[in-house]
């Protein structure tokens, strides 16, 4: 019985998501920017926000106290409904961000295509577990919406980190910028800045809390970088991937 409920909700969520996605003019514009080679990771975050918004709308319409048995999101239902649609968001967003990275690499004469990160299955399981603990699903709706958005935006963060690691290992000098959103919390403001990437750096700058809209960019800058531990600004010139 509950399996039938899961499949009915999943099919309805997927149908509504596909409808929203296919008719979106904003998505069409963002995909066009990939085709024309104009896309940046700012577009990756815009794309992620649209995708998360579509999924949240589909979930809100089809996963309710009326469609769930006893008004509760049991774990196996969460696993059968939320896990596949979250994984779909990850695929859509990381593929978009990968294509953006390919464009950026080409502009910097880097002969490597962008890469996609592995899905973080533990985070998906964590979301399923968190929202299946509530006795009344409707009381958790806002939190679930925030988690869907956070997870989808983090797919961009993870893609950028994956590519920064890859290029750094090849000897390219990667610089990471984190921009705090207007009105950001104290924690996010403390992370705002430009950082010289290294394999041993603190990767907290790639993390985000619920409802965080901060963005992360990667580039190959000259003349300035910020040490991730001391946050002091150094002036200099890059030569062979090192500051002189």
Language-model-detected regions and their locations in the chain:
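Domain-core detector
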Residues: 1-209, 217-244
